[in-house]
Amino acid sequence: LEGRKNRLSIRSLMKWIALLFIVIGLGVISFPFVQNQYVAYEQDKLLHQLEAEEVEEVSGEKSLTQRYEELNAILDQEAASTTSPETKEKPSKNLIGKMEISSINLELPILNGASMENLKVAVGRMSGTGIPGEVGNTALAAHRSYKYGKLFNRLDEVKIGDSIHIETGNHTYAYQVENVFRVLPTDLSVLKQPETGSILTLITCDPIQDPTHRLIVQASLVKTS
């Protein structure tokens, strides 16, 4: 009788262990989906801010070299990581607009500053670069990984001649893609500021896994409305 009780206890324990492994497995499988839903939720909140005209004015500051080094460190760190880091930081609320690239079905909020927190849910404007619609070179960066939703994952599909629209609180700026190329992370020439005209420069990692370069998409302003 005692032996039978022991066998029943062992079976019961094994059932609980099996159930525990099932729960853990479901958690691992569902985590990317839950995380992507959270990112989508944060993006929707930011886009609704734009509709409510809660848009912030921006101005240039700090050295471009320092800002680009900081951006490269963030892009490389996130690309090398295989798990989402634990953080209580929230993206800053300084929404400056949204970006649409219809050719790749992309619509994303744009936040002022390419910080780690901002780039988890949105496109970040590199501080010290131009302002959308004005004379200068506006540098916008985003991740190209599978951890934070889609973001710039399909940026390599953009072609010369494609349209990019930047909407701020008062205006919509239409840019036309003129160049798509790759550079080393240390190449600062992509941030060169023109004396005339408004340029848009999109920056992300390339390739998605173990990136060695930066994928660059540059476009020129063709219409303001």
Residue locations for each model-derived region?
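N-terminal Lys/Arg-rich, disordered targeting/topogenic segments
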Residues: 1-10
